[in-house]
Amino acid sequence: MKKLLTCIALGFATTSYAVTPLWMRDVQISPDGTEIAFCYKGDIYKVPAKGGTATQLTTQASYECTPIWSPDGKQIAFASDRNGNFDLFVMPSNGGTAQCLTTHSASEIPSAFTPDGKYVLFSASIQDPAQSALFPTSAMTELYKVPIGGGRTEQVLGTPAEMVCFDKSGKTFLYQDRKGFEDEWRKHHTSSVTRDIWMYDTQTGKHTNLTDHAGEDRNAVFTPDGQTVYFLSERNGGSFNVYSFPLNTPQSITAVTKFKTHPVRFLSTSSDNTLCYTYDGEIYTQRPGVNPQKVRIDLIRDDQEQISDLNSSKGATSATVSPDGKQIALTLRG
């Protein structure tokens, strides 16, 4: 008689329960500093900046990422691949129906709202300017803007300009460049291809290099008064940490955080000068002159697989008996 092997499939009962999420991405604090938006497992959430229960804002089966706040905090723009490629969407920050702003076949990733809240800037590889000397590849994007109500897109820059941050006047913005194909998650990279921080004058069209460092400098943000710049850097031989410099003397760089081992990522700031970033998979906030504070997050999810019985009479391999002889571990169906 054939032996019947019964394998209990891995999984948990389908119930709603609170978890403490790790490795959240695309974290951004709201303009007033009261809430934090983030991406977790392909959905957009927000949580009080002081910690608490996170609110899920998107529920599509698609992947949503890169949430950015409007200046008044009433809307959140984000990227979603619900239509195939990543398109730009905007929705009320308290949840609701999302409106699609772009429909190009390229992927569009939001970067910032203009200070008047009328446009969203985004990166996409749509059309290089005729005078461009860049190699024509989708990895080297251009910077565009689209009206918040949807409509015709307009090219802002024909060269890669990522992680845009405006000053309050809207006359200048910070951005990180992209010179080549290096993986953005690579650590301790030192070469001429690493990213630098630039400032762009929207009235004169002038680009000013604010960092000239062989390592990575990225994700720059203004303080509320526009006089100081915070940014992430791997300088001083360590992992990514937060640094700052006065805008009028960019060479006077000061370390703000001194984390070890893991990189700091996803830097943003609010109108009350609260910094927000991630470290070792968790979200932190930090006030000037105060130690970083970890944000406690409870997240309710109902997406675990249901337990089921899997019956099989053949195909089991690599079986081994537990030390007490009561259980057998085996490989079945890969």
Language model: regions and residue ranges:
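Glycine-rich phosphate/pyrophosphate-binding loop
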Residues: 310, 315-321
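Hydrophobic h-region of N-terminal signal peptides that target proteins for export
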Residues: 9-17
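Residue-level detector of Asp-centered blade-edge/turn motifs that repeat once per structural unit
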Residues: 31-32, 71-72, 115-116, 168-169, ...
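A flexible loop/linker signature enriched in serine peptidases of the S9 family
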Residues: 19-21, 39-45, 53, 58-64, ...
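Positively charged n-region of N-terminal signal peptides that target proteins for export
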Residues: 1-4
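Conserved beta-strand position repeated across blades of beta-propeller domains
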Residues: 28, 68, 112, 165, ...
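Mature N-terminal segment immediately following signal peptide/propeptide cleavage
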Residues: 19-49, 320
